[in-house]
Amino acid sequence: MDLYSLGLLDTLRAYREGRATVQDYVASCSQRISALEPRIQAWEWFDPSRAMAEAEERAGGILGDLPLFGIPVGVKDIIATRGIPTRYGSRIFATNVPVTSAWIVRRLEALGGLVMGKTVTTEFAYRQPGKTRNPWNTAFSPGGSSSGSAAAVAAGFVPIAIGTQTLGSVIRPAAFCGVVGYKPSVGAISRTGIHPISTTLDTVGVFARSVADAAWFGACLMGPDPRDDATLVKGPEKILRVPLEPLRAPPRLAVIRTSKWNLAAEPQRANFEASVIRLREAGAQVRDVNLPRLFDDAWENVMTIMSREAVRSFLSIESRHRIRLSPHLIELLDRGHRVTPELYGRARARRDEYRRWLDNLFERNDAIVTIPAVGEAPEGLASTGDASFAQLWTQAGMPAIAIPSGFGPRGLPLGIQIVGRYREDQAALEAAAWTEATLGFKPGLAGG
């Protein structure tokens, strides 16, 4: 077996059992990158000699009992890394090299992990695509904004990668690239040292090859950070504990198609309905839930919040470099400038209404099941896809997990999405692990 094909937990097990060393594993991943990166272009920055030096440093230390010992991680290039270029997907920061790492980077390194490299992001994690291609077919998009992170895990470059989501930037690329994407509850993981778009919506997420791997890594990254007030709301030990426990009984699942269902392509709808039948036959209590008219303006509402907060986040950059921003980002900022304080306040209040209504749904259900994207990845690199089936859960701050569920007619991955109650990631991930095992679909690694 090629070592690069091992997931996070399998790699830790191989280290413990003496079947692999950190140097062996990182070398295998580096060779995989050397072979496929020219076609996929998942990396904004990757230095194989530095990666091997990091591996040798880990192997020579006494970190073997740490939960991320020797695990190479892809870090989205919206996240500050000390001594490593951090460009935010923008030519404005082409020469930027931070002197301090983001909280989550310091965290993963303290737990024994190593930064394998910086993965491609869209411009400032918004809509302007980067250079990354879908590893299943390079004529198609990998999704975004966490394009490189999803592609790197799918191609076997790293077992795990970090992304961020403001609308659908973890869930959608995970679905397009055929990997597991876990977007935790907002505030579960610190955002200090990550370039913001929206303080209300921005969430750190994880790409992995299994739900168990995603949960393990996500739990490692959680912890209170005084510089990010959202992390202080509820202790991480109350959000997620690992390893995940198997469910004692099949979950109660609320099927929500949303008013955007007509946007979904027929192969995605058919795959979803077949998946729901499989879950029901396996014992899940499945019931359809229709969202009330309250949610009809959810897209307009999230854009009001996002655009207004983006104006604050980009105040300095816009004042000095507006001409160097993409039309997509300028459009967002122009929209934000038109949002009055009163309109912004109403949008925040409406967001709270969404969360309360959805929270009540979990009195009778363990998780929501829906689709993660409209279908297979779009052709070309002009668009990273539609976030319609991810934005509502992001807006409400709820945990969401994308799971591969099949291939579409173009040979590209399709997925299913499990959504949990706000700040109850444990139950969401346990339902997702059950769903993953029940569907039994393993896409394998992309890229040959």
Predicted region positions:
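Short helix-loop capping/hinge segments that flank enzyme active sites or metal/cofactor-binding pockets
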Residues: G64, L68-Y88, L247-I256, T304-D359, ...
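A short helix-breaking turn/cap at a secondary-structure junction
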Residues: K183-A270, T438-G448
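Serine-dependent amide/ester hydrolase catalytic core
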Residues: L9-R16, Q31, L247-R248, V311-Q395, ...
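Short, well-ordered beta-strand elements
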Residues: V206, L412-E424, A428-A432, E436
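An N-terminal boundary/leader segment
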Residues: M1-R50, E281-G283, L343, G444-G448
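Acidic/His- and Gly-rich active-site-bordering loop/insert found
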Residues: A51-A53, G61-K131
